[in-house]
Amino acid sequence: GFTEKFYREVCGARLKPVLESLEHLVATGVWVEVTTLLLEGYNDSDEEVRAMARFLKGLSPDIPWHLTAAHPDYRMLDLRPTRHATLARAHAIAKEEGLRFVYVGNVLDEERSSTYCPDCGRLLVRRRGYRVEALWEAPGVCPGCGQRIPGVWTW
């Protein structure tokens, strides 16, 4: 979620230190990826998703943002599982806001969980569930247009 109320009531924490930590990490050159567990009815409104996307873009449009489906577990057994349509909507909002690397997780969605070149649109890393296939010869470089793809590429 992107409100102090959500962080306090659902996470038992405060939002401000999380945001400050992200700002510090990005400012000092640490590679950062962010995962948000989307809880339907808690932190999945268009306004909240848009606010989160704008904050991340303000740090860098290249920060990968993983929008992850939730399911009933542990202390939230009454939680409704995050619908695929909710993830797809959040993904679209994040892309509209200018984030270049947005992914959905905890669902099977090859298109929205794979990595594409933000310049030419070429598929670079295909993800099918837990299977990952790199489709480039030089990690971090699009073979279609030569665009550098930010990240920590170890294969």
Question: How would you describe each model-predicted region?
Answer:
Residues 1-82:
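Conserved AdoMet/S-adenosylmethionine-binding subsite of the radical SAM
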Residues 46-155:
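Auxiliary Fe-S-binding modules of radical SAM enzymes
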